[in-house]
Amino acid sequence: MIGPAFLKQGVRHTDLGPIGDYPEGEYMVTTFVSSNEGDVARRTAFIRNNGFLGSQPSFTILSNHCAHLGCPVQPNGAVQYKQVSTFPGVTRLPVNPSGFGCPCHGGQYDTEGNRIAGPPVRALDRYSFSIVNGHLMVGKPFSVAYVIGLGAGAKIHVAKYSFPGEPVSGLESWLYPIQPPH
């Protein structure tokens, strides 16, 4: 009877509040609970409102898990420890990062999540998102090989979601051992 424990384990979209709560061009360290399991399912993401791309709102939503070993990445630069929490279950801290860094092994990322130094093998993972009734909904994470450009006009080279340490492009991605499904 192990089977039922593994049913319905898909990622649900989580409501992060009205898009107006995210100032254009500014990153917010956003902490949210991604399911009904409570605090054990708490996630943190770096969210920037990029304004509009055509007629659609554009957001950059970076995971805070380092692409090296999964340690928590921190913003490099000043953090305003003024908590902004206007939506239930969602906590936001405004930041103005010059990039992001991993304190564990020194991995460094630029403001688009590209790896710029240290041992990580790829860019920071991102979350998919949608806008429903004017609210930002965060969805499944996905891996990124690299990003060219900035903000709404950035070209994201998407890869299937991979564990930390797994290359997602180049020869290394073909040589890496096959991983179990996630």
Residue ranges of predicted features:
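N-terminal pre-ligand scaffold of iron-sulfur
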Residues: 1-91, 131-182
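Short Fe-S-cluster ligation motifs
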Residues: 92-152
